[in-house]
Amino acid sequence: MKQTKYIFVTGGVLSSLGKGIAAASIATLLKNSGLKASILKADPYINVDPGTMSPFEHGEVFVTDDGAETDLDLGHYERFLDESLSQDNNFTTGRVYQSVIEKERRGEYLGKTIQVIPHIVGEIKDRIKKAGEGKDILIVEIGGTVGDIEGLPFLEAIRALRLEVGKNNAMNIHLTLVPFIKAAGELKTKPTQHSVGELRRIGISPDMIICRSEKALDRDLKDKIAISCGVEKNCVIESVDAASIYQIPLNFLKQDILNPIAEILDLKNLKPNMENWDSLVKRVIAPSNEVKIAFVGKYVDLKESYKSLTEAIIHAGAALDTKVELKWVDSEKLENMESAEVFKDVSGILVAGGFGYRGVEGKIKAIQYARENKIPFLGICLGMQLALVEFARNVLKLKDANSSEFDEKCENPVVYLIDEFMDTNGEKQIRTAKTPLGGTMRLGAYKCDIKEKSLLAKVYNEAKSVKERHRHRYEANPKYRVDFEKHGLIVSGESKGLIEAVELNCHPFFLAVQFHPEFTSRLEHVNPVICGFIKAAINYEDN
């Protein structure tokens, strides 16, 4: 069997430098060179997965087709690679320890003392190898920063794995910060030197340095970094702040990043075809048109909470040659504001998902304003559920209508908790209000059957069904379906009896979906729901 080659990506100095974007950019170039490339994110935190972490703590939880709740970097990987990944492409310290402890309880270690080396490190290596099966090359991003105590087992694993597979089958790329000191008017390399020194103490010598900086590095500075860090001069790559993250692969390509990679890994001459990508990036950076939409959410102070959705909107804008300006609206603050004043200058209203009661009434106000004023509207996940609540209260006149998530004693629960459902593996899952939160939602891709001649059908180019990803615990209550449809709110999408999409039949564009269309949107293949909504907003603006 052909040996998979590995590129290990580590980060130094501080976090949030963009290791995920750098890794995804390199993977994109390799894939477009004809290689079967994939990416793995290894997170050193002890949570089993990010599913129960606060959006303010971790940002978005990205969901894969097979229902894994993963790091938001997996979203970047999918959007850059234009491929669907799985639970094998992300794991945490918590997941590793959970697996090792379960094996110990089953007696698989035959009574041995369980230790970080070899057992924890061995589990990490096994998971890396599994993710690389059937691939020409696997890029492994190690979360956190070199020097973090929780990252040591991961660094030991990649050190050992490189020795195991041989020098032409693995390389290390270290991404570090080269800060610009305004008072001195110069870039400083000392943090990079210290970071590489820390990495070497662990037993890893980088083959390539990627330098994050707000200003370009001149040749002398690159040579200084190469000499002090012990890498070839053509292996110092700059990653300067860009107008769009989708520029990064093109910026890397201009610096011939693939030449040293091909040399180190003994690969054929790599010449990626990036023409279509380049064309789309130009439309992202300098589009011909502009439209403004309101983005109504409860986590608007941390935009990373909606990373896939904001990226999907960028994809739609590129496809339509339009800059989409987002007007961020805090749903909690909206409760005490005048809707007409807030939405007077927008051509569309998007109500995003979320959990918990805070800000719910503000979202309902936004939905009511979009419905009554015939402004293009898209509701996602909780946004669909609240569209049902708003319609029930203001059209069906069920003033106490609510979701049982927010009022368990509600007499008209138009949204409720179902006790049983089939997961993506076809297995029955049972949940109650007291079920543990971790991993108990309806997660992953499910088939949605589409009503003929509906807005949803038009958006999906008359497809009879689609598969989209979910992450929710509560469902639309079918008890109210007849009354909803009698008054014009049509169910246009279903999944084995569960309501997946609703729309208004006397409105230019009023669509609400239970699934998350943003999770399957890519720069080169925008999700039809997002694109349809932005197109409707453009038409509203023009008219």
Curated annotation (Swiss-Prot):
GO terms for cellular component: cytosol. CTP binds at residues 15, 148-150, 188-193, 224. PROSITE patterns: GATASE_TYPE_1. Keywords: ATP-binding, Glutamine amidotransferase, Ligase, Magnesium, Metal-binding, Nucleotide-binding, Pyrimidine biosynthesis. GO terms for molecular function: ATP binding; CTP synthase activity; glutaminase activity; identical protein binding; metal ion binding. Disulfide bonds: none annotated. Catalyzes the ATP-dependent amination of UTP to CTP with either L-glutamine or ammonia as the source of nitrogen. Regulates intracellular CTP levels through interactions with the four ribonucleotide triphosphates. CTPSs have evolved a hybrid strategy for distinguishing between UTP and CTP. The overlapping regions of the product feedback inhibitory and substrate sites recognize a common feature in both compounds, the triphosphate moiety. To differentiate isosteric substrate and product pyrimidine rings, an additional pocket far from the expected kinase/ligase catalytic site, specifically recognizes the cytosine and ribose portions of the product inhibitor. NCBIfam families: PRK05380.1, PyrG. This is CTP synthase. It comes from Campylobacter jejuni subsp. doylei (strain ATCC BAA-1458 / RM4099 / 269.97). The gene is pyrG.
